[in-house]
Amino acid sequence: MKEELIYGRQPVREALKSEKRKVKRLFVMEGAQGKIIEDIKQLSQKRKIPWEIKDKTFLEELVGKNVNHQGVVLLAQPRASLTWQEILKKNKTSPEATVVFVDRVEDPANLGTIARTAAFFGVEGILISKARSAPLNSPVVRASAGGIESIDIAQINNFTQVIKEFQKAGFWIVALEADGDKDIWDADLRGMPLGLVVGGEHEGIRRVVRSSCDMVLRIPSRGVINSLNVAVALGIGIYEVMRQRSTN
């Protein structure tokens, strides 16, 4: 199995904490200090992962001269993913479970921010289309600030078929689109497990995927810009779900 490099203090710490991937070795730049650095060292010792002090040149040769590694690099195997069936089985009995369907998001920064947002709100899982999606590699981990390490992820081939299986299990599937049928705050999102669907940077949600959803909602705009970055839209969407669920 091909190994990956994880870099940045927060991503490295979260990778060590989550134990979702096997780690081979930790490299710490000489002179690197701070609480997170100490946390990283302690976690590596707890997991019996060998670590070495290296100079700046060594780390730059590993990850690239223009990469902000923040003085720590982790050599690890790719993180373990689940199947969509496993994510569904874990959450189908929860009336307030929330999962995210990501349809063809190609920018690693956007996919990483989606994972960070989902982890922040405690979303139960992310289901990502395999076709035309950013790979779950080091830039995605970095953009997620390590959030991708703590959340269940599945990569799926037949996107619409998986949506139908979640619907059969009682999930209500909601697409977020700029031209949605109604404003998100006018929809009742309480009392049911939800799947929120977001689409790629260029085409949005594919028509065949959109037609499979139970609702298509929009985030209302009052300015001259009529659309949001996909990760920002998802964050607002999840927040509205959580807000509604917290009220009677």
Each predicted region: which residue ranges?
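Active-site/ligand-binding-proximal alpha/beta "capping" segment
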Residues: 174-229
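RNA substrate-binding interface of SAM-dependent RNA methyltransferases
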Residues: 17, 21, 28, 85, ...
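Short, hinge-like loop/turn segments at secondary-structure boundaries
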Residues: 68-72, 142-147, 190-194
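Short, acidic/turn-prone active-site loops that include or flank metal/cofactor-
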Residues: 31-32, 57, 131-133, 201-203, ...
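Short hydrophobic alpha-helical runs that function as membrane-insertion/retention elements
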Residues: 52, 126-129, 218
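N-terminal positively charged helical leader segments and presequences
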Residues: 1-89
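Structured adenosyl-cofactor binding patch, chiefly the S-adenosyl-L-methionine
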Residues: 142-147, 207-248
